[in-house]
């Protein structure tokens, strides 16, 4: 699964929409309130790590680095 589909799956899993997520990102983290901006970043694969952390935050997730087993 690519990052675009993974993020969209989490949005759906949380019972929300891209519009609602973008609105919350705009209020909480000062993002542009434009759904096409987020959608384009996901399509192009240009979402920054800091943006991914903020996106996870508004969806109620933490990004955790875990060492793989050998």
Regions found by a protein language model. Give the residues of each.
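Alpha-helical residues within the helix-turn-helix
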Residues: 23, 27, 57
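Recognition helix of helix-turn-helix/homeodomain-like DNA-binding domains
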Residues: 28-46
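Short amphipathic recognition helices of helix-turn-helix/homeodomain-type DNA-binding modules
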Residues: 66-70
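A short, Lys/Arg-rich alpha-helix, primarily the initiator
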Residues: 1-24
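DNA major-groove recognition helix of helix-turn-helix/homeodomain DNA-binding modules
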Residues: 49-64
């Amino acid at each position: 699964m690519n990052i675009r589909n993974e993020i969209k799956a989490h949005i759906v899993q949380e019972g929300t929409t891209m519009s609602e997520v973008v609105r919350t990102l705009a209020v909480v983290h000062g993002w542009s309130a434009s759904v096409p901006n987020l959608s384009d970043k996901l399509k192009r694969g240009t979402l920054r790590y800091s943006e991914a952390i903020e996106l996870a935050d508004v969806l109620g997730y933490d990004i955790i680095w875990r060492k793989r087993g050998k």
